[in-house]
């Protein structure tokens, strides 16, 4: 029988507080979380050098963890009025409107595979996964019926329900789904109606 003692880290919890003065997707850390520690006493039984059983005799908290407190925004922004950021820089290879006899509902921006894709505005991820012909797809809900979509991705770096700030990396560009070459397909939708992104993008794409 061998008795041992060791310390174990106690992870901290994260508490969220809704804040109507912050926009959706914005967060402010009020209190930084700190892990705690516990002193563990254990007993292990060996027979002929082989471990037979082990049990915890006692567990005493010596440092209490400090919870992390984060304020989460609930205020909606009129992103169409204030303008959105280009999700990446590259050459526009296809514009919004009719293309090959059908309506093209966004912008195609030609870039090398693996180019970081940024959120055009703060919001909450409403979809992240296989979008069929869109390939790997991310959608961000910006409130007031406005959603942006980022398609043909190689890699997705966010999950559904995650709050993101503007210009936060959400993915890497790619060539997945129905695609004729490496590019990002970017859409802006208001109440399920596609809009021409060029009317609402505010930074120079160069």
Indicate residue ranges for each PLM-predicted region.
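Catalytic cores of peptidoglycan-degrading enzymes
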Residues: 79-206
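Membrane-proximal envelope biogenesis segments
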Residues: 1-83
């Amino acid at each position: 029988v061998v008795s041992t003692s060791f310390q174990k880290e106690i992870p901290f919890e994260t508490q969220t507080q809704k804040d109507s003065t912050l926009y959706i997707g914005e967060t402010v850390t009020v209190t930084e979380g700190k892990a705690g520690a516990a002193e563990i006493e254990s007993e292990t039984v060996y027979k002929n050098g082989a471990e037979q059983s082990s049990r915890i005799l006692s567990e005493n908290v010596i440092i209490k963890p400090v919870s992390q407190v984060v304020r989460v925004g609930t205020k909606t922004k009129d992103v169409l009025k204030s303008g959105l950021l280009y999700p990446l820089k590259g050459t526009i290879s296809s514009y919004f409107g009719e293309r090959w006899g059908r309506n093209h509902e966004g912008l195609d921006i030609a870039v090398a595979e693996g180019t970081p894709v940024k959120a055009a505005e703060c919001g909450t991820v409403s979809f992240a996964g296989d979008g069929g012909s869109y390939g790997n797809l991310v959608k961000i809900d910006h409130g007031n019926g406005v959603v942006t979509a980022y398609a043909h991705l190689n890699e997705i770096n966010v999950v559904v329900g995650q709050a993101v700030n503007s210009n936060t990396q959400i993915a890497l560009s790619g060539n997945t789904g129905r695609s004729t070459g490496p590019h990002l397909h970017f859409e802006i939708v208001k109440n399920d109606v596609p809009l021409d992104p060029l009317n609402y993008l505010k930074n120079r794409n160069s």
